[in-house]
Design a protein with these regions (language model features):
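Conserved acyl-donor/pantetheine-binding loop and adjacent beta-alpha core of acyl/acetyltransferases
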Residues: 66-101
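Conserved beta-hairpin
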Residues: 49-65
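Conserved GNAT acetyl-CoA-binding A-motif
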Residues: 110, 117-129
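C-terminal "cap" of GNAT-fold acetyltransferases
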Residues: 84-85, 150-165
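A short beta-loop-alpha structural element at the N-terminal edge
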Residues: 2-16
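Conserved acetyl-CoA-binding loop-helix of GNAT-fold acetyltransferases
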Residues: 96, 102-115, 138-142
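Conserved GNAT-fold acetyl-CoA-binding loop/helix
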Residues: 22-42
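Conserved beta-strand-loop-alpha-helix junction that forms the acyl-donor binding cleft
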Residues: 127-137
């Protein structure tokens, strides 16, 4: 698997990954993203800003995420404390096609994200997720992300995590 910048012509495929993840989250009984966010336009905006990335394998695109190297204003206020005050990257909108899930996919994805961040001289990664997203909590624990507290993002409280390499 590889992590590479998303291309404009891949926006629909990336959005389908988001839709597959939405359906998966609903099947688990929670909503990670509201129906009006993220949209395909959100992905096009990510791509235009150079922060949209795809995970691909021999069959093509299997996942999408947004990686921002630098400040996330929503993370300035936290009910808790971040592990580091060094520069960091933020991962948003991480989603995979249903057919691709399992088999160590998240482990490989986070390894690629860490490598990408290190190549950009950043060794801390932050992200947030819904309280109900137990699958992601498990993945983040396994990947040595530490729960840091609550932030307000996208209209409500989110659990904030940080990996400090």
């Amino acid at each position: 698997m590889e992590l590479r910048p998303a291309q404009r012509q891949e926006a629909a495929i990336c959005y389908q990954c988001i839709e597959d993840a939405r359906a998966y989250h609903r099947s688990l009984g929670f909503i990670q993203w509201h129906p009006d966010y993220p949209t395909q336009q959100t992905i096009l905006d990510d791509i235009a800003r150079g922060i949209g990335y795809v995970f691909s394998d021999g069959t093509g695109v299997i996942g999408y995420c947004c990686i921002v190297i630098g400040d996330e204003p929503a993370y300035h206020e936290i009910d808790g404390a971040w592990k580091t005050d060094r520069p960091y990257a933020v991962v948003h909108r991480m989603a995979f096609y249903r057919r691709a899930r399992g088999g160590g996919l998240s482990k490989e994805a986070f390894s690629l994200i860490r490598t990408f961040c290190r190549s950009n001289h950043v060794d801390a990664i932050r992200l947030d997720t819904q309280q109900e997203n137990k699958v992601m909590h498990h993945i983040l624990d396994r990947e040595d992300f530490e729960y840091c507290g609550l932030i307000q993002f996208d209209g409500g409280p989110k659990l904030a995590y940080e990996w400090d390499g």
